[in-house]
Amino acid sequence: MSSLTLSRRPRRNRKTAAIRDLLAETHLSPKDLIAPFFVKYGNNIKEEIPSLPGVFRWSLDLLLKEIERLCTYGLRAVMLFPIIPDDLKDAYGSYSSNPKNILCHSIHEIKNAFPHLCLISDIALDPYTTHGHDGIFLNGEVLNDESVRIFGNIATLHAEMGADIVAPSDMMDGRIGYIRSKLDQSGYSKTSIMSYSVKYASCLYSPFRDALSSHVTSGDKKQYQMNPKNVLEALLESSLDEEEGADILMVKPAGLYLDVIYRIRQNTCLPLAAYQVSGEYAMILSAFQQGWLDKETLFHESLIAIKRAGADMIISYSAPFILELLHQGFEF
């Protein structure tokens, strides 16, 4: 049987692994990944989170060893989240401004141990509040301006401790401009701001809240986090944060919002981060544990999709696992 007369045969560019690699448009490397870690008081603690298999709450001593191990695989950036005991929480999140809290102490110690590492700190109140909201909660409402002033103080404190980048995750109006001003006035003009500029009110955060032992006791976060139905609002939020002085923008969650990542990428020249959140990680792990899908290729494919949509960097709980695979030369 004679061959068809075709001027173009795209399959020629897929016929061997070498050709496919040569022509690949999107690549994943250790430099693309930010590893998030939960740190708590104590010693010799590595406590697996039930809703996040393979993710742990670490005491600082063991976290330092884990970071050292991952640096041999090419780890370049970490993001820290604190586990705060209930007896240190109050309605105002006062402990967030204590320079001796576990997050401040961890920033200082990790930066001293790994000065080459990019250290990103979480700027939020929900780990420290009894009500679980991301700001001061009064009479059924999260107070915007009063909360923003606290975030400015926290950001300055983290910069003093050694954070390279502060990452406000609260979604209050005007917080980027206020934090930038506070940092500059305090002598930290070199400290960058990674803004959670587009943070949707998603159901995919539940395992993260389990990890922090932080749950909303009254109301919800829909009055300040974004409506999943909207994308033009995402463009507005990101442009406002850019105008206010953000150095890096972020979309959270990532996997269900690839269109948003793409749209923002077309509208900004700033670096763009995406957060593959706890629920995304948990869904992939659940499918693997049920024997339905392959963990290695699914994590890789999900991260490639996020990069292909336009993200320059990805925060993912799979980062330690992927770093090991990349180091081993795993063929995806």
Swiss-Prot record:
It comes from the Bacteria. The keyword Lyase applies. The active site is at 199 (schiff-base intermediate with substrate), 252 (schiff-base intermediate with substrate). 5-aminolevulinate 1 binds at residues 209, 221. Mg(2+) binds at residue 237. GO terms for biological process: protoporphyrinogen IX biosynthetic process. SMART domains: ALAD (SM01004). Its EC number is 4.2.1.24. Catalyzes an early step in the biosynthesis of tetrapyrroles. Binds two molecules of 5-aminolevulinate per subunit, each at a distinct site, and catalyzes their condensation to form porphobilinogen. Belongs to the ALAD family. This is Delta-aminolevulinic acid dehydratase.
